[in-house]
Amino acid sequence: MAAKEVKFTSDARDRMLRGVDIMANAVRVTLGPKGRNVVIDKSFGAPRITKDGVSVAKEIELEDKFENMGAQMLREVASRTSDIAGDGTTTATVLAQAIVREGAKAVASGMNPMDLKRGIDLAVEAIVKELRNNARKVSKNAEIAQVATISANGDAEIGRYLAEAMEKVGNEGVITVEEAKTAEIELEVVEGMEFDRGYLSPYFITNQEKMRVELEDAYILLHEKKLSNLQAMIPILESVIQSGKPLLIIAEDVEGEALATLVVNKLRGGLKIAAVKAPGFGDRRKSMLEDIAILTGGTVISEELGIKLENTTMDTLGRAKRIMVDKETTTIVDGAGSKEDIGGRVAQIKAQIEDTTSDYDREKLQERLAKLAGGVAVIRVGGSTEVEVKEKKDRVDDALHATRAAVEEGILPGGGVALLRVVSALNGLATANDDQRVGIEIVRRAIEAPVRQIAENAGAEGSIIVGKLREKQDFAFGWNAQTGEFGDLFQMGVIDPAKVVRAALQDAASIAGLLVTTEAMIAEKPKKDGQPQMPPGGGMDF
């Protein structure tokens, strides 16, 4: 086992604090609408330019092991805030640095670290409660656009596209961000339910120009197993032909004689039909077939449920206003399922998302939820160079998470002002001793840090801005760093999601509290490389 180096008390805290400062100072320059860029060297390819706090934090690794521990603890703040709220990583880092600095001073002056931490926790609890009470629900499309614009560092175009995407697919819909081949931002919205399965034979195509199958007001037959023989299907096929409506068959597979018979009937013009494979695999396939059944008001033909193909009636079939099938995808628009059934299924999937511990399962469940509840929107981000595209994509990702957070828990005045306004919640908090009272005062001072940093990044004096904000008690009154004006931040469109502000403060205080209460640090001793031995002379004469 390698030898370890141990540092205690002030020596440990000083080394750790240096690491915290290096990390925070690199991240904090990106805060606010006039935040600066950070250039990150890559081992291959062009350097990456970003204004995303968590991206900067993830790149920092320090040579000194003890300093690095402090930096990595601060990186944890950014990562946790990013995971919970998707944005606010720089705010969380700035808050954590402020709490750690003030806490370290208090510990150095002889106060009990555990009581300080208890005081910090009491203060954060009170502030979070006050933030929740003051959050305003997001109702208008314009407010969503404002949240997205702020999070995208003032890019109104990104804000507009995200608001449009949210409006079209709803709060439960899936919005994905991809890199575009052009220099513009593009939005593509897929209506209805789409899954990655195309037609089983090109002979089913009805629109030769677009090379796809288009069925209007169609029936849908959902079968869990393979179809290789149509004998059992003849009664239901005859009923469909009499109705004069098209039919889409979704089964594990349609092969051999069954597929040939369907193609021949389609070509002869007797039957408007198409067949596709069921999406997914194993148990996920069963769940997705059930989703399609609920969306279209049909029933999955499954022997496990005691439903046989030969006993199928028209009531078993699903219905949809429009179905489009191309080589790789099938889209079902406007299914005939009842709103109550779809709502019940959505609630069931949401419960599964809450329970699952697997990121992969959660992602797949969210995809299913989107297909049932809203739709899928794809935002394609373009730019002149690869570096620009990546930087813009980072900002769109941040903005997307911020808008979701705003819809979830509401909005607050932006620019760090919300934290300043709820400081009154700390007045009169009951504490067990003076050290806990100092912990509360640490948080009172620390929550000014985001406003000060935003002001400094915009070229203003932080203490002057904080002083002017304190002169007025109006909750929404603040400073717009983009324009340099004071006024109602809600009206100016400078707003932050309540979830982002809350998560930033909670995560910052959590990690900062641990750093303040650290009394010893252990790291591996760096290995000293000795001088290599001189090679033997090999019989040379001197």
Curated annotation (Swiss-Prot):
Subcellular location: Cytoplasm
EC number: 5.6.1.7
Inducing or repressing factors: By heat shock.
Catalytic activity, reaction form: ATP + H2O + a folded polypeptide = ADP + phosphate + an unfolded polypeptide
BP GO terms, sorted: protein refolding
A Pfam family the protein falls into: Cpn60_TCP1
Keywords: ATP-binding, Chaperone, Cytoplasm, Isomerase, Nucleotide-binding, Stress response
UniProt-listed PROSITE patterns: CHAPERONINS_CPN60
Class of this enzyme: isomerase
Binding site residues for ATP: T30, L31, G32, P33, K51, D87, G88, T89, T90, T91, G415, D496
GO cellular component, one term: cytoplasm
Recorded family membership: Belongs to the chaperonin (HSP60) family.
PANTHER family: 60 KDA HEAT SHOCK PROTEIN, MITOCHONDRIAL (PTHR45633)
Protein name: Chaperonin GroEL 2
Gene: groEL2
